Amino acid sequence: MKSVRLAAFAAASLLFTVSLPAAAQNDPFMGGDYVSVTGVSIDDGHYMDYASFLSGFYKAQEDFAIKQGWQTSYEILSNVHPRKGEPNLYLVRRFKNMPDAAEGDRRQAMIRNQVKMDETQMQAASGDRAKFRHVDSEMLLREMKWRK
């Protein structure tokens, strides 16, 4: 009796193992680009302060990332009619894959060299912006592409 139950369990396990690849073949989607979305709110009276940062330092950094092939695009979206508690802006970045730790460190070093700032200076600048700019949300999404 014990061997019959064991055989039945093994057969059921095999059934599930075989059906998983079949289900994957039927999935009409495959993963595409990753999309990073950061929701940012800006205190009243500080729009131009943050807009100046975005049009200078931020734009240069994002353009550098595209030139290096690290990301495919970026955009800034304005929340035209934000409800209470919603961000004013969404910073959107698209990229093909996630770097491993070593590659991430290499990229950070290249960015610091490009902007001529060390980590302490970059953190201090971020802290200065945090007086009027607040990161409300961060999402990492993945594009769902149709299989052909």
Segments from the language model and where they lie:
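N-terminal signal peptide c-region/cleavage motif recognized by signal peptidases
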Residues: T17-P21
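Short beta-strand/turn micro-motifs at beta-sheet edges
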Residues: A24-P28, L77-V80
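An amphipathic, aromatic/His-enriched active-site/gating alpha helix that lines ligand/cofactor pockets
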Residues: N26-F29, A60, F64-T72, R94-L141
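Acidic/histidine-rich, surface-exposed loop or edge segments in extracytoplasmic proteins
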Residues: M30-G45
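Hydrophobic pocket/interface hotspot
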Residues: T38, Y50, L91, A101
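Short, solvent-exposed mixed-charge patches
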Residues: R147-K148
